[in-house]
């Protein structure tokens, strides 16, 4: 894990050959949806382990079948709220809950509109109560403009103030990180890798495309048929 010196509390994993290999597969346009989803699950699980390394531990005494010895517990691991941004973050959440099995889960459906406005539409929110002992992990694979995450994090604040607010993603653009840190300087950002920037449509470059479409298939738009009213 590498601390990026451009910002406070921003970390990437360029130093991990294992994660870089998974990311390479995700970037490849020929990777199918099954492999793509599995890759996201793996990254969520591994990055969850890395987050645990930053949590407080407490030494305890236990009895083995042979004698007394000393061990540890990670106290904060049981006070985690994972907020998933539908739909692309679902595999990330699957990986995270393998590490934080006691986590409470929040679900937010939020999507970004087209350039140049990039307006955010949020139409479903289910978030549990958040306490001052909680670590909130907001999972969203792509931190592009940061607009979606800022909207979600503003919503999260209505449910309480956590001990830690963590954003977990796969790829990030500097533009998105800048906007998040301006609005939420206390936020910690963990991403597999930070890419060079955005194109005119707000996509990360070199990126990996639309994570939701690649994980679950591109949605189709069904035309709305006119309603026919009959008169008895």
UniProtKB/Swiss-Prot annotation:
Allosterically activated by GTP. Keywords: Allosteric enzyme, Glycosyltransferase, GTP-binding, Magnesium, Nucleotide-binding, Transferase. Its EC number is 2.4.2.9. It catalyses: UMP + diphosphate = 5-phospho-alpha-D-ribose 1-diphosphate + uracil. GTP binds at residues 38-42. The keyword GTP-binding applies. Uracil binds at residues 204, 209-211. It comes from the Archaea. Its cofactor is Mg(2+). 5-phospho-alpha-D-ribose 1-diphosphate binds at residues 87, 112, 140-148, 210. Pathway: Pyrimidine metabolism; UMP biosynthesis via salvage pathway; UMP from uracil: step 1/1. Binds 1 Mg(2+) ion per subunit. The magnesium is bound as Mg-PRPP. One of its GO terms (molecular function) is magnesium ion binding. It holds the Pfam family UPRTase. It is an enzyme of class 2 (transferase). One of its GO terms (biological process) is UMP salvage. Catalyzes the conversion of uracil and 5-phospho-alpha-D-ribose 1-diphosphate (PRPP) to UMP and diphosphate. Belongs to the UPRTase family. This is Uracil phosphoribosyltransferase. It comes from Thermococcus sibiricus (strain DSM 12597 / MM 739).
